[in-house]
Regions:
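Conserved active-site alpha-helix within GNAT-family acetyltransferase domains
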Residues: 1-6, 126, 150-168
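A short beta-loop-alpha structural element at the N-terminal edge
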Residues: 32-46
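Acyl-donor-binding surface of acyltransferase catalytic domains
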Residues: 1-30, 173-174
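Conserved GNAT acetyl-CoA-binding A-motif
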Residues: 136-148
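Conserved acetyl-CoA-binding loop-helix of GNAT-fold acetyltransferases
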Residues: 115, 121-134, 138, 157-161
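Hydrophobic alpha-helical core bundles mediating ligand binding, dimerization, or RNAP-core interactions
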Residues: 44-52, 73-76, 136
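A conserved beta-strand-loop-helix scaffold within acyl/acetyltransferase catalytic domains
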Residues: 56-113
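…primarily DNA-binding HTH/wHTH and HhH modules…
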Residues: 161, 165-181
Length: 181
């Protein structure tokens, strides 16, 4: 007997990139923001996966993460190195993968601002989000879209930063492995 899971509910956010403040993505020392290199796909995937797995808001969404988020990360990074890392010393503690030209119905903020749990609530997620939006703006985009869980701390506090406006809720596509079952 197979166990059916409820569809993953998401909320979509939109940012007008012309309204992003110029100095929004500043990080305080000892944290360093840098662009990930083309050979760092595995590191980006590991940070994104750990961030989602350890976030209680994404509990019960393992198939969505495995079948939708991680392939989106890999697709975006295979096209070009569009990932920002936050480092603390030699350790990568945060990542944000973005796609400048997503497929229809996809989002620009593929992973969102993923920060290791022990480094959260220090302004790192906000700086990572702002820097990602600035990177998209620098590539000529005028607006960006992203998804998160409804009523989560990211939906309440992070995504509204820098002019993020909540749009209609969406249901994530069914995971590939669930559809095949």
């Amino acid at each position: 007997m197979s166990i059916t899971s409820k569809p993953v509910q998401l909320v979509r956010f939109r940012w007008d990139l012309s309204a992003i403040p110029a100095e929004a993505g500043q990080l305080s020392k000892p944290f360093v923001l840098r662009t990930a290199g083309p050979n760092e796909i595995e590191e980006a995937m590991a940070i994104v996966l750990a961030s989602y797995n350890l976030d209680p808001e994404w509990s019960g969404c393992a198939l969505h993460i495995k079948d939708n988020v991680l392939p989106g990360v890999k697709r975006a990074l295979t096209k070009e190195p569009t990932c920002l890392f936050v480092q603390h010393g030699n350790r990568i503690i945060g990542a944000s993968v973005y796609d400048c030209a997503p497929e229809e119905s996809e989002v620009h903020l593929v992973s969102g601002a993923c920060v290791q749990t022990e480094y959260r609530n220090r302004g790192i997620g906000g700086a990572l989000l702002a820097s990602t939006l600035e990177a998209l703006k620098a590539r000529g985009l005028t607006e960006a879209f992203g998804h998160t869980r409804p009523n989560s701390p990211s939906a309440k506090y992070l995504c509204p930063k820098f002019g993020g406006t909540k749009m209609a809720p969406v249901v994530a596509p069914p995971p590939i492995s669930a559809a095949a079952a």
